[in-house]
Amino acid sequence: MNNIPVLGIDVSKDKLDCALCVEGKYKSKVVTNNAQGFTDLLNWLHKWHVDSPHVCMEATGVYWEASAEFLAAHNLPVSVVNPAQIKAFGGSRLVRTKTDAVDARLIAEFCLRMTPEAWQPPSPAEQALRALVQRLDALQRMHTQERNRLSVAREAVRKGIADHLAWLDKEIEALTKQIRDHIDGDSDLKQKHDLLDSIPGVGERTIAAILAFGASPDHFANARQCVAFAGLNPRQHQSGSSVNGKPRMSKVGHALLRKTLYMPAMVTLYNTAWGKVFRNRLALAGKPPKLIIGAMMRKLLHVAFGVLKSGQPFNPALHGA
C-alpha cells in the first residue's frame, strides 16, 4: 500500500462522484462531467493542497474519456481500470452497499492498495480517429434501423425513409473515406495500418477500430491485457464438483471493439488458409462453433498485437499456430 493521495472517481454520463483519500482520511465531491466540472475538481484539490493525487476510474463506456484526458493533460497520473477489477475488489471487501459515493470510495481504496499502472492518453491523431470511428458506427446503426423500418413501413412514410437511407449511404461513404485519409495522413497510424492490413481476414473497419481504441503495445503491456480490454477473455464458472459451467466470453470491456472483430473472425475461419486450420483444429477437439468464433476473435487481437509489437507483417508460420 502506498501513502500518496489517491482520488477515486465513479463516472456517469452527467457527473463525477469523487473520493479523495489523504493519509487515510476521505473527502467527497461531486462535479459535472464537463469542462467546468473538471476545472471545479482541480480547484477543489488545490483547496486541500493536493496537487498530484493518483487518479483512478473505471472504463465506463465513453463517459470517462474527457475527464481522463483533461486530468492527464494537467500532469495528474491517471489509471483507467476494467470495471470487473473493481467489482472483484468490492466482493473481496464484502461491500454490499452500492451508491455512486460508495463506488468512488471503493475505487480509491483499490487504487491505494493495488497501485494500478498509469494510463497513457491517446495522441491527438488517435483521439480524432476515435471520434470518426464512433460516428461511423452510429451512422451504420442508424442505417440498419431505417432499413428495418422500411421493410414494414406504410406507403405514406416510405419515401421519407428511402430518402434518409440514401443520405446515410452518402454520409457513410464520405466518412469511410475521411477515416482512411486521416490514417494515411499520419505516419504512425499509416505504419500501423499497413502492418494490420497484412493479416488475412482483417478489413479496414477493424483496423480503424484497433487503431482508434488503442488496442496496441502503446497502451497495453501484453496481448492478454488487450483481450481483456475488449471483453474477449473467457470467464470460467467452476466450484468444487457440483458447479462446472461452460467457459463464456466475459463481455466486460469495449463493446464496439469487440463487435468489429466478429465478422473478421467469421471471414478468417471460413475464407483464409490459416483460419481454416485454426477452425479444424478446434472442431476436432470437440469445440462448438460459437466457441470457435470467440476464440478466433481473441486470436485476431493477439495477432494484431503481435505484428504491432514486432513491427513485422503477418507470418502464418508464427501467428497461425
Would you name each region that the model predicts?
Residues 209-285, 289:
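Phosphate-backbone recognition surface of nucleic-acid-processing proteins
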Residues 24-54:
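Nucleic-acid-processing active sites and adjacent nucleic-acid-binding tracks
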Residues 241-242, 278-321:
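Low-complexity, acidic/Ser/Thr- and charged residue-rich accessory regions of DNA metabolism proteins
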Residues 2, 69, 79-198:
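Long, charge-rich intrinsically disordered scaffolds of nucleic-acid metabolism proteins
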Residues 1-21, 107, 139, 208:
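Gly/Thr-rich phosphate-binding beta-strand-loop-beta motif of the actin/hexokinase/Hsp70
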Residues 52-63:
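Short glycine-rich phosphate-binding loop at a beta-alpha junction
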Residues 170-183, 187, 204-218, 259-265:
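Amphipathic, charged-and-aliphatic alpha-helical interface segments
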Residues 203-204, 226:
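Small-residue hinge/turn detector
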